[in-house]
């Protein structure tokens, strides 16, 4: 029987268990995927802890991103999908579909093909990161040549995707990381500037880099008290995206700074893209084209075998990585 990852109580990575499950047949609008690799995301850790946008229905599976081969399709699904190498797009609830396992059921609407030159591990590191960054930076902010964009948590897979998008559009990226030990690697990955926020004054550095104007776009997954500094670093009329809560602290609204600068501070998740068919089609085309011509390339931080799933999530939680943590599935 195929193995899947499941948890029966809330907690950290240690509550995850590898269990056997009877093979399932896909229903209407579904496919069965033989998984080759799975990309890990912080949203999944928040889900396991009961801190995500949706609460898990226990016992629950886990996982948004898998790459593999379609082995079977539902009664209303085009049979041409069978045999194709695909990866999954986070366009569903993990209470309905969970992608971390040897064999999974996925909605056909959440499948995306990836260029043949990518490995399954790289294919599992595409859609969450690039679609999250695309939706905010391109679809909403219309990032353009010469724009300054601040990218906190820049060593994450989404942060690296945002840096690559900025480079492709001719914008100037200001990556931030807590300490200076990741600076050289972030610069090598395309960041134009890197600020170590525990060692430097982010507001002063952004003002210096932008010639006193501030950044028009800020793409932040941290929130908490850090938002006040980001608002100070923003340009007049700038837009601040809050797409995460890594700090897990209360997030005071910087009212007077927002009023004085006319800032737009908005919450954002990639579901704004993935649950709208027209937006998703445009996003997939944008990402696929740039993967194909080499402007985008997933950065893999570390690969773990399926049996070490708990260790893989602990590594993700350590913040030691630069790029995507991936699990390979036998």
Identify what each model region corresponds to.
Residues 95-97, 177, 225-295, 328-330:
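Glycine-rich phosphate-binding loop and adjacent beta-alpha segment
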Residues 124-200:
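Mid-domain Rossmann-like dinucleotide-binding core that forms the NAD(H)/NADP(H) cofactor-binding site
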Residues 2, 295-302, 310-330:
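C-terminal capping/lid region of NAD(P)-dependent oxidoreductase domains
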Residues 85, 148, 172, 238-239, ...:
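Short glycine-centered segments of the SAM/dcSAM-binding site in methyltransferase folds
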Residues 201-212:
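Short amphipathic alpha-helix with an adjacent loop that forms part of the alpha/beta core around
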Residues 87, 150, 218-219, 241:
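N-terminal Rossmann-like NAD(P) cofactor-binding module of classical short-chain dehydrogenase/reductase
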Residues 79, 88-153:
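NAD(P)H dinucleotide-binding glycine-rich loop of Rossmann-like/cofactor-binding domains
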Residues 22-39, 51-92:
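Glycine-rich beta-strand-centered segment in the early N-terminal region that forms part
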């Amino acid at each position: 029987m195929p193995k899947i990852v499941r948890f029966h109580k809330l907690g950290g990575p240690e509550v995850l268990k590898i269990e056997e499950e009877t093979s399932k047949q896909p229903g209407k609008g579904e496919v069965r995927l033989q998984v080759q690799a799975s990309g890990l995301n912080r949203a999944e850790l928040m889900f396991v802890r009961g801190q995500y946008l949706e609460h898990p229905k226990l016992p629950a599976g886990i996982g948004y991103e898998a790459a593999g081969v379609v082995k079977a399709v539902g009664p209303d699904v085009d049979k041409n999908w069978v045999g194709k190498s695909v990866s999954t797009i986070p366009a569903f609830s993990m209470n309905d579909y969970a992608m971390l396992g040897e064999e999974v059921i996925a909605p056909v609407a959440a499948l995306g093909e990836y260029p043949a030159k990518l490995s399954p591990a790289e294919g599992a590191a595409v859609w969450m990161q690039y679609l999250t960054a695309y939706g905010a930076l391109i679809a909403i902010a219309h990032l353009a040549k010469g724009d300054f964009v601040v990218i906190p948590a820049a060593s994450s897979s989404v942060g690296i995707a945002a840096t690559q998008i900025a480079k492709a559009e001719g914008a100037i990226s200001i990556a931030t990381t807590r300490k200076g030990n990741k600076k050289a690697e972030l610069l090598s990955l395309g960041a134009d500037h890197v600020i170590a926020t525990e060692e430097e004054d982010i507001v002063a550095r952004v003002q210096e880099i932008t010639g006193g104007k501030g950044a028009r776009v800020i793409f932040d997954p941290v929130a908490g008290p850090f938002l006040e500094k980001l608002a100070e670093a923003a340009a007049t009329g700038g837009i601040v995206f809050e797409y995460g809560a890594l700090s897990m602290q209360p997030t005071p609204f910087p009212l007077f700074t927002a009023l004085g600068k006319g800032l737009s501070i908005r919450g954002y998740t990639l579901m704004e893209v993935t649950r709208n068919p027209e937006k998703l089609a445009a996003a997939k085309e944008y990402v696929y084209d740039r993967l194909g011509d080499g402007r985008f390339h997933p950065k893999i931080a570390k690969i773990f075998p399926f049996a070490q799933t708990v260790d893989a999530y602990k590594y993700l939680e350590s913040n030691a990585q630069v790029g995507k943590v991936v699990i390979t599935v036998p």
